[in-house]
Amino acid sequence: MWNPDFFEEHGYCIIDDAISESGVAEIRNTINRLCDENLLKKAGIGKEGSFELDQTKRGDSIFWINPLEAQGGTKEYLDFMSEIIISLNREFYMGVRDYECHYTRYPVGTRYMMHSDKHKHTSHRIVSFVFYLNENWTEEDGGTLRVYTEGNNFFDVLPKAGRLIIFKSEMLHEVLITNRIRESITGWMLDEQRLF
């Protein structure tokens, strides 16, 4: 359940069963179709001149979502996120004006090293969100999201189907090595409108 007070105090909130099981399955099927059609692209680190592809640092492949074309489970999820955005703006005057997100797939043996989603190339990201699609996920499957809090403490989030984590984009986090294919929708709320 979305808890704005918890988010304000801790900088994050975890919501289980954010959308219907059928919606989760539809999104998973969409990612599998994109993979079969070779439309998922290897993700890199940095922008323009500093862009690099390095599977040891970041191993996922992605496909950007156009919200205007979203259907089925993806639309159900984006509608849910729109309600969260309304809540954040109403409760905390956060100034969220837009969002961007992509389908994400990590092959077995990959990870994403510790990083922050907000830096000089992405300064307009204010809140990050990850929605997981992985059925019957266990700790032995790896692929945990580790989020760092003050004092170098951290908490781990198991990427099980239907789970959504929302957290402030400046928080350091990493994806630990996954022992199964790991799928999600990953995105960011922005304090400016995107230019297509």
Regions found by a protein language model. Give the residues of each.
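Non-heme Fe(II)/2-oxoglutarate
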Residues: M1-R90
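Conserved short histidine dyad/triad with adjacent acidic residue
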Residues: Y103-T122
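A short coil-to-beta-strand element that immediately follows conserved catalytic motifs
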Residues: M94-H102, D141
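Short, conserved, surface-exposed binding loops centered on an aromatic residue
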Residues: R90-V96, K118-S123
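Short catalytic/ligand-binding loop motif for oxyanion handling, primarily in non-cytosolic enzymes
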Residues: G23-A25, V108-Y112, E174-V175, R194-F196
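Catalytic core of Fe(II)/2-oxoglutarate
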Residues: H119-K120, R125, N134-F196
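Extracellular structured ligand-interaction cores
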Residues: Y12, D98-E100, G109, I126-V130, ...
